[in-house]
Amino acid sequence: MPARFPNISSRAWEHPADRAALESLRKVPGFDLVVRKVMGLLSERPLKLITLGSAVEVGPDQYPRLNALYEEVLQTLDAPERYPLFVTQNPVMNAGAVGMDHPFIVLNSGTVLQLDDAQVRSVLGHEVGHILSDHVLYKTMLRFLLKGGQLLTRMPLAGLPLLAVVAAMLEWDRKSELSADRASLLACQDPDVVRGALLRMAGGVGDGANITAFREQARRYEEGGSALDSVIKTLALLNRSHPFPVQRMGELDRWIESGAYEEILSGHYPLRDEDPDESTWDYWRESVGSYAEGVKQSTDPVAKWMRQAGTGVKDKASGAWDWIRGRSPDETPPADEDELPPGPEVGPDGVIDL
């Protein structure tokens, strides 16, 4: 069984872009109103009842091997409780964490059939990571907004403001996957297991699939091309809930190379009992700073151009913060700036969330 991490905080695996994007999402005009409206329309009970009626719940007497893997993941990440786990009939290799106050996890049958035990463990770690990072509420809301169809037209926010909120939620949603991939690695503690799962998700099935070649493909995707290619890559992601598998592999490799993964394995990690108030400016500033440092190390053409042109991502982020607060960049911040608050497939029947 992998090493356990008692009292580990989700901050240990959260990608700085995830935290920064979530903070930015909360600043989008109309976001609070969208949350209130969707919460008024959504109910956790129907989601749970439909899943209970249409899928198979995992337990000691049902999928006992899968249940044992799941219990190990919960212990490894020191989850405070067991979240119900279901397997639903769907050949697509995928999984998802669903719900609000009482989340649960759904594995597609294709995931159980196509992955080995270690890879299934990594998928379970990914989903538990989403829950422990408090991603599930917003993810459930986003799937509802994307699938709401005509129901959304009855909402007073329908139109451009709502589109802006959905676009911001999609951007955060993609970044949240990078955090969950790190939790996935902590759950299985073998980088090649997570890489293998990403390879299979991208189409690498059968004995001929090669992790080393796929990592080289990821490197070529990230480094190759011009700044225009980077724009094309960005546009290609706009309507996707997940980054491309090669991007996820590259991000995971960078985290490993940074030494942060080994640091956690050695027992040095932030503790849940010491989690800061996420509403503080210091917390957001730390996320922006970490994200900016990642861009400095990036081989992406746009990031290279920004460095060569002397454009600092951190400065841009600070400028955005000033704009959010309605303050001119030239104004001197108040003495108590740091104390200011930051201010202003969901369901088992489809491809959900790996």
Residue ranges and their predicted role:
Residues 133-136, 188-189, 240:
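Residues in soluble alpha-helical coiled-coils and helical-bundle/repeat scaffolds
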Residues 2-140:
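Peri-catalytic and regulatory segments of divalent metal-dependent proteins
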